[in-house]
């Protein structure tokens, strides 16, 4: 903070340098971002709802996410707040159990009136249901006129995470980012919003959500290329989530080595594979946290229909999705052991338990190191840019100095030449003026009244006197005497 003003002044408020300084500050904070990416229809919103343990984000088959959601765990178990900007003015929506209130400069705006109406009409009495209704309206508000952006791209949400999950019990400060699907043809702002949001990410866990059947698609490969271009988002910690795995035709006894090799060689997977591939059923994982109490009837029906398959080992179609995970053997074996010991069988068998365990491990063991690496990377970038600017300014000053010295030497020569000319002119002028002055003095000031005859007489007297003084004979005689 002390050095920043100096650097910014030196760099003339360079946007790129300021952004990297922001990233340094962000990386030094204790926040652990979980950056969730994926093309629409992959079930990103449902997956994030499962991580949180409640249905707050709108979800469905259509591209529903048009904004970037930044979701943090609330300090109180019965309080939540949504913060965003509308027409560049901050709005906060507070939810406290069954109480809802708004904090805004203009509480009479059309948007707030619509939100108030929707929340009051909400037949879901719980806090999460009202949040879901409010977010759905905010998310869809600009679709009325896609050329007008009146709501900020980032929506900040603080909501209590379920204590039935690892993230909700963790002391680590996890913050989840939900980004728009990048392949939505119905919303032209998706790619732009995604790129703008990713530009500010740092020190996070990249989580790529896809489906087993579409993982080798061109859309996924294109999305991976975008992720790999994000500066300082370390792909070494990327988690690949095969969502809706319970709907996929997976081999009963797991993948053999040849199939694992084939999956790893898919273009998108080959680009992104690092910490592992996780097979997950977000609906079942969410149901394991909320005891099967869903707002969405389809989710409730799905969970109710499949519950026995995840809870009863004697069931003919008993599912353990974590056994399909593809990752280093040491990590895989550890997740196996922990999942088998987990008392919540549905949570473990849905694969979500293994995902959250890996996130907690990253935050507890590797985040501090990663923060140092990120700070080092960003500071190196700032130092490099600053050094480059210093070198440029030094070179400019040196060149300017040489130029000024050359100009001064030329000016000095011109000045000396001018002084010589001026001096000579002054001397000549003085000589001419002196002659003129003497002549004028002699002619006008000195007056001799002797006539010619008088002058001749004086001359004769002078010569006579001079002759007597110069007569050697007289002087010799006087000497002898």
What is the predicted function of each stretch?
Residues 8, 14-15, 20-334, 342-366:
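Globular "head" domains of long coiled-coil molecular machines
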Residues 12-15, 120, 126, 325, ...:
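Short, flexible coil/linker elements and helix-boundary hinge sites characteristic
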Residues 43-44, 66-71, 189, 195, ...:
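A sequence-level detector of short, solvent-exposed, charge-rich linear segments
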Residues 330-350, 361-400:
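C-terminal helical "lid" subdomain and adjoining coupling/linker elements of P-loop NTPases
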Residues 384-481:
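A non-catalytic, extended alpha-helical scaffold characteristic of dynamin-superfamily P-loop GTPases
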């Amino acid at each position: 903070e002390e050095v920043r003003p100096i650097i910014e002044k030196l760099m003339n408020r360079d946007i790129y340098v300021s952004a990297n300084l922001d990233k340094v500050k962000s990386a030094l904070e204790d926040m652990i971002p979980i950056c969730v990416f994926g093309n629409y229809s992959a079930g990103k919103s449902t997956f994030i709802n499962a991580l949180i343990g409640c249905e707050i984000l709108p979800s469905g088959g259509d591209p529903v996410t048009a904004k970037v959601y930044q979701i943090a765990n609330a300090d109180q178990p019965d309080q939540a707040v949504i913060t965003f900007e509308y027409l560049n003015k901050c709005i906060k929506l507070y939810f406290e159990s069954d109480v809802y209130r708004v904090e805004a400069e203009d509480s009479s705006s059309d948007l707030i009136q619509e939100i108030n109406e929707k929340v009051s009409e909400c037949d879901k009495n719980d806090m999460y249901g009202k949040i879901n209704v409010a977010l759905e309206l905010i998310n869809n508000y600009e679709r009325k006129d896609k050329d007008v952006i009146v709501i900020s791209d980032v929506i900040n949400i603080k909501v209590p995470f379920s204590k039935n999950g690892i993230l909700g019990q963790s002391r680590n400060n996890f913050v989840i980012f939900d980004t728009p699907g990048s392949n939505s043809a119905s919303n032209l702002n998706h790619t732009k919003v995604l790129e703008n949001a990713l530009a500010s990410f740092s020190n996070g866990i990249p989580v790529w959500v896809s489906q087993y059947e579409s993982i080798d698609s061109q859309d996924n490969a294109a999305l991976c290329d975008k992720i790999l271009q994000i500066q300082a988002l370390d792909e070494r910690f990327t988690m690949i989530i095969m969502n809706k795995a319970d709907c996929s035709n997976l081999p009963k006894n797991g993948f053999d080595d040849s199939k694992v090799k084939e999956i790893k060689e898919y273009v998108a997977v080959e680009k992104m594979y690092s910490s592992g591939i996780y097979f997950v059923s977000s609906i079942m994982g969410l149901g394991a946290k909320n005891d099967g109490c869903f707002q969405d009837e389809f989710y409730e029906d799905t969970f109710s229909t499949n519950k026995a398959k995840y809870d009863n080992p004697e069931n003919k179609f008993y599912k353990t999705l974590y056994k399909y995970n593809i990752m280093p053997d040491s990590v895989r074996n550890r997740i196996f052991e922990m999942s088998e010991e987990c008392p919540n069988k549905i949570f473990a068998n849905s694969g979500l338990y293994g995902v959250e365990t890996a996130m907690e491990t990253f935050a507890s063991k590797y985040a501090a190191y990663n923060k140092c690496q990120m700070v080092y990377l960003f500071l190196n970038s700032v130092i490099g840019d600053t050094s480059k600017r210093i070198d440029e300014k030094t070179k400019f000053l040196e060149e300017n100095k040489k130029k000024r010295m050359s100009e001064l030497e030329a000016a000095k020569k011109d000045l000396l030449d001018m002084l010589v000319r001026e001096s000579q002119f002054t001397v000549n002028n003085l000589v001419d003026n002196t002659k003129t002055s003497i002549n004028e003095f002699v002619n006008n000031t000195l007056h001799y009244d002797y006539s010619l005859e008088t002058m001749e007489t004086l001359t004769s007297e002078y010569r006579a006197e001079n002759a007597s003084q110069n007569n050697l004979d007289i002087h010799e005689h006087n000497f002898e005497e």
